[in-house]
Curated annotation (Swiss-Prot):
Signal sequence, renumbered to the chain: none
GO annotation, biological process: negative regulation of translation; translation
Keyword Cytoplasm: no
Organism the protein comes from: Desulfotalea psychrophila (strain LSv54 / DSM 12343)
Subunit structure: Part of the 50S ribosomal subunit.
Molecular function terms from GO: mRNA binding; structural constituent of ribosome
Primary role: This protein is one of the early assembly proteins of the 50S ribosomal subunit, although it is not seen to bind rRNA by itself. It is important during the early stages of 50S assembly.
Source taxonomy: Bacteria, Pseudomonadati, Thermodesulfobacteriota, Desulfobulbia, Desulfobulbales
Listed NCBIfam families: rplM_bact
Protein name, UniProt field: Large ribosomal subunit protein uL13
Family: Belongs to the universal ribosomal protein uL13 family.
Record bears the keyword Phosphoprotein: no
Assigned keywords, A-Z: Ribonucleoprotein, Ribosomal protein
Matching SUPFAM superfamilies: Ribosomal protein L13
Length: 142
């Protein structure tokens, strides 16, 4: 008996909306990454993108446990000698509230073309409003 592989044109991608208010960042990000990959579906294959679209609202109200607001640092490099920059989670939330969730989910996805394509299906917004009402997203309680 052969393993069933759904053809790419038959894969139905659903839309989900997640409210991030008072949700712990890592727990929320791991569930989102799993849904973006399609691991919750019985037709999951690691080499086929059959994940769903996820819309995250209230990104500015995400929660971190312990002293992570001050201790957790994000690094980036300018490309120049000695050009490493670091930002705490609190500073990142003030400047770019959506990046906190996006960076957490990106770290949980594959580091290849498919991972980049799956990350494009993640839509993160500040506040409760989002422009994807036409897709009729289902509320996902995590």
């Amino acid at each position: 008996m052969k393993t069933y592989l759904a053809p790419v044109n038959e894969i139905e991608k659903e839309w989900y909306v997640v409210d991030a208010e008072n949700k712990v960042l890592g727990r929320l990000a791991s569930e989102i990454a799993s849904r973006l990959r399609g691991k919750h579906k019985p037709t999951f294959s690691s080499f086929i993108d059959n994940g769903d679209f996820i819309v995250v609202t209230n990104a500015e109200k995400i929660a971190l446990t312990g002293k992570k607001w001050d201790d957790k640092t994000y690094y980036r490099h300018t490309g120049y000698i000695g050009g490493i920059k670091e930002t705490s989670a609190k500073e990142l939330l003030e400047k770019h509230p959506t990046d906190l969730i996006t960076k957490a989910v990106r770290g949980m996805l594959p580091k290849n073309k498919m991972g980049r394509a799956q990350l494009k299906k993640l839509k993160v917004y500040v506040g409760a409003a989002h422009p994807h009402a036409a897709q009729q997203p289902t509320v996902l309680d995590i």
